[in-house]
């Protein structure tokens, strides 16, 4: 199963992220190395949200990420949510569905 971690970023995110970015990126790359985090990054124009794609049997990896993320701990993330995502197309789809 896939899970989307969606961050609503604070208005001053770009100005403040520098001091926390290395720790945040280490956390993300470590989650990727464990096979939990597939992709992640901020949306552009405007930079008001970020989306991280996790895979696993439950949303636990995404929730652990949030609990450890310096962006969340230091107020760069105003709100967050984890949503299950039923992926049906693509090589790594969790529930592949092909045309009949």
Predicted features along the sequence, with ranges:
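Conserved, structured core segments of small domains
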Residues: 1-100
């Amino acid at each position: 199963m896939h899970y989307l971690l969606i961050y609503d970023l604070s208005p001053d995110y770009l100005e403040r992220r520098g001091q926390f970015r290395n720790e945040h990126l280490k956390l993300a790359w470590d989650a990727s190395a464990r096979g939990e985090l597939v992709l992640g990054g901020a949306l552009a124009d405007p930079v008001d949200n970020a989306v991280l794609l996790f895979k696993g049997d439950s949303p636990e990896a995404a929730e652990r990420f949030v609990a450890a993320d310096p962006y969340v701990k230091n107020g760069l993330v105003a709100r967050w949510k984890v949503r299950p995502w039923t992926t049906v197309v693509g090589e790594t789809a969790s529930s592949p569905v092909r045309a009949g």
